[in-house]
Amino acid sequence: MYYGFDIGGTKIALGVFDSTRRLQWEKRVPTPHTSYSAFLDAVCELVAEADQRFGVKGSVGIGIPGMPETEDGTLYAANVPAASGKPLRADLSARLDRDVRLDNDANCFALSEAWDDEFTQYPLVMGLILGTGGGGLVLNGKPITGQSYITGEFGHMRLPVDALTLMGFDFPLRRCGCGQMGCIENYLSGRGFAWLYQHYYDQSLQAPEIIALWEQGDEQAHAHVERYLDLLAVCLGNILTIVDPDLLVIGGGLSNFTAITTQLAERLPRHLLPVARAPRIERARHGDAGGMRGAAFLHLTD
């Protein structure tokens, strides 16, 4: 059995998957915020419960935000302070007496989608989360992590020149939480979608409200969505020219907006090299379970 943990600032979620990659059981507990020993206990108790329930010693994979293992073997995860700065992988491997594998949660999202029954035919899969700006790359069923675990942090690329041509050269470059100016996640995420609407129309609406107006045929919302899709295509043009994936899977809250997957493909070719083919574009299939799935499938990559 394959055990996949999706760990964040508020919850530790465990999903147990069988050899056919089907979810058999799941359980969630709150994430301890201050005590590292309590954090380790929470994970180990869930593993023990799964072992007893299924009568096996399952493999353990963990998806967590941040850098799973720094040069000195410790975790860097600002959203999980109880474990950040600690040798999480080594400690859990010792306590559980098995090979524990860690990866970035966005990489786990991409891995989950790449191992979907419909998508395993594609050698190079790119996952993009239109919410956090994160993403990941999976080649032949294995995540590409890079030495710093930042492969796929597409949201921290800066606005390209073509974006400024589209939006205007006086378009404000917003400061990102990472400290840089003009990171594309500040414009393409759900909050960015709402910020763009407020910037152009001086109205403060949330993304679902804007989408509802679009669905009702509102002209202003229609113009906003057209501009947003053009901006998304411009930014993806740069990324796809570098990565050239077979499949692009889009997740996050905005992925539920069908216009993104249905209308994006027709906009992409003008921003790619003439010989390039746009990838197949699909909405993420596995929703909230994606993090657990991808973490569990870290043991399918041998």
UniProtKB/Swiss-Prot annotation:
Transmembrane segments: none annotated. It catalyses: N-acetyl-D-glucosamine + ATP = N-acetyl-D-glucosamine 6-phosphate + ADP + H(+). NCBIfam families: PRK13310.1. Its EC number is 2.7.1.59. The lineage of its organism: Bacteria, Pseudomonadati, Pseudomonadota, Gammaproteobacteria, Enterobacterales. ATP binds at residues 4-11, 133-139. Zn(2+) binds at residues 156, 176, 178, 183. This is N-acetyl-D-glucosamine kinase. GO terms for biological process: N-acetylglucosamine metabolic process; peptidoglycan turnover. Keywords: ATP-binding, Carbohydrate metabolism, Kinase, Metal-binding, Nucleotide-binding, Transferase, Zinc. Pathway: Cell wall biogenesis; peptidoglycan recycling. Catalyzes the phosphorylation of N-acetyl-D-glucosamine (GlcNAc) derived from cell-wall degradation, yielding GlcNAc-6-P. Coiled coil: none annotated. Belongs to the ROK (NagC/XylR) family. NagK subfamily. GO terms for molecular function: ATP binding; N-acetylglucosamine kinase activity; zinc ion binding.
